[in-house]
Amino acid sequence: MCRLPVASLIICFWLVERSYCNNSLQDSMRELHTRFAISLYQTLTETENNSNLIVSPVSVSLSLALLQLGARGNTLAQLEGTLGYNVNDAHVQDFLSHSQANMKNNSQGMWLQQTCTLFIQSGVQLLPGFTQLASEWANTSVVRANFSQPNQTHSQPERAGHQQDESWHLLAGSVSGELSGSGEAQAEALWWGHRPQVALVNTVAFKGVWQKQFMFTNTQNLPFVLSDGNVIKVAMMYQAAEVSFGQFRTASEQRYTVLQLPYLGRSLSLQVVLPSERKTPLSSLEAQLTARQLASWDGGLRRTKMDIFLPRFKMQNKFNLRSVLPALGVSDAFNPAAADFTGISEEGLYVSDAFHEVRIEVTEDGTKAAAATAMVLLKRSRAPVFKADRPFLFLLRHIKTGSILFMGRVMNPADQAS
């Protein structure tokens, strides 16, 4: 019989335990991220009424995690309670770093831009420890801002041990990259109060190519029934394909279907969620979404040959999360009398604004294209049909980590207003 040395046995047990701990942490973080995503989305639906909506939960959570690095006392407790984890934990930091690295992989056919910028009042003395941590945080930067003159900021991000004093004009799109025009709007929104301020700006944009592209020649102008019962004509994409599909029920026994369309490389997928009954309002499904339901999709989707009808849509939303996050438990950070960011500076900072800007475009191939003009007659098929011809939810998820990059709804595909 082969006998392993004691040292080898110890190493084996250590590797098994480490693997178990990593898997346990990954499962826990996945559920916490999903819970936060749903809570954030459901809170936004209460204020956005029946309009198109999109939000990037992973981008917002990244911003709150950055604030955690400098928060103390009850401010830290609220941020930790909302996210469900403390980023000061080394294991959590490692997990988040790996997750960001996985999502940052811009391969052929996929482009993802995510930034988080912390604007801090010019002249405030920052603690070197915080600037060092912030510089190591994925896709983030700390920038000087003159809140008394909204069109003046400081161009260079903070580096550990250095202060920047040069001012510059915040050009349109300077914060948001390709989200043109947003920079000036963000600058104008900054205002000077009685205490030094922090403004948090995060932006995210995605463009991807389908694993199996829709043919432009199959796109037709077809009816789409709005929530008020009115019918409009929209550009409806079509393809026959084998996809992941499942039927589910909410806690109140309302039936709904989930269709999953992978992007090129299969690291990301778009999940389209549609009430099975036409009379079921989308708001009813939105209110009953839970992390457990989303987890059940992973095991409940089956490969199915289907005829797929999906409207082409494009949307962009801008939010000041200052009016949203208190409902999720983050209030002290925005309160000049209660905020505790002594891990950033000893000069009494608070968050004046938290801007979130996000956009998405879904077309036949994932890129901008002119509308197809040809009308096509499609042959009859015995395959099941998934037809998103009424309001629906969508989630763009990272397959490996389960992170929800985007979550939103399409109430009117023809409405492209931001």
Language-model features and meaning:
Residues 2-418:
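Secretory/exported precursors with cleavable N-terminal leaders
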